[in-house]
Amino acid sequence: MAIYSIKLVDHRNSTSAETAPISASVTRIFGLAFVGTSDSIRVSWGAGNPGDDLVLHFVADIASSYLRQRWPNMTVSPNAGGHTHSHGSLSGTELYRTTPAGAIPLRRYGALAFHEALHNLFPFRSDQHTAMGGGLASANIPDADPNDANKSFLRQGFSVRTHQLL
């Protein structure tokens, strides 16, 4: 029985009125992938550490990118709600509080984080949007729970350790 650690790292001094619903959303959506299995997840806020299976950095917006401190030349779609960048054996993921369209609803972070996790946990693939079952893997992330194919890919991704940008 594996317990996969998902660390949420706040880079914007978020209030508990923001962090609690984000954590609840991430826990619920990721937890759906492990229903009926002997594995589970543990979601917590704090600094990332090498033992974490997935580290998600929360920043104000693209201009406040944490990933660009490590990879200054990476490109991000200007309308993205999050971004994952991998180089060599290292993957980093960040989620944005605001986009040009406005603030992202807190309840949507579970689906957004799940989508970005598929990029993070499969750093050598570039076909996540088309080959991982649609749904939350799609380029335009629906306001929905993960489908069975999404869940299967997430479990597969967690089964192999990907080095995380801390």
Q: Across the structure, where does each feature detected by a protein language model lie?
A:
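Metzincin-family zinc-dependent endopeptidase catalytic domain
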Residues: 16-128
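Generic structural signal for residues positioned in beta-strands
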Residues: 5, 55, 92-94, 130-136, ...
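The catalytic-center signature of Zn2+-dependent metalloproteases
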Residues: 102-166
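Short beta-strand segments enriched in small/hydrophobic residues
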Residues: 1-14
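N-terminal leader/targeting segments
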Residues: 6, 32-36, 137
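Alpha-helix initiation/capping motif
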Residues: 15, 96-97, 142, 161
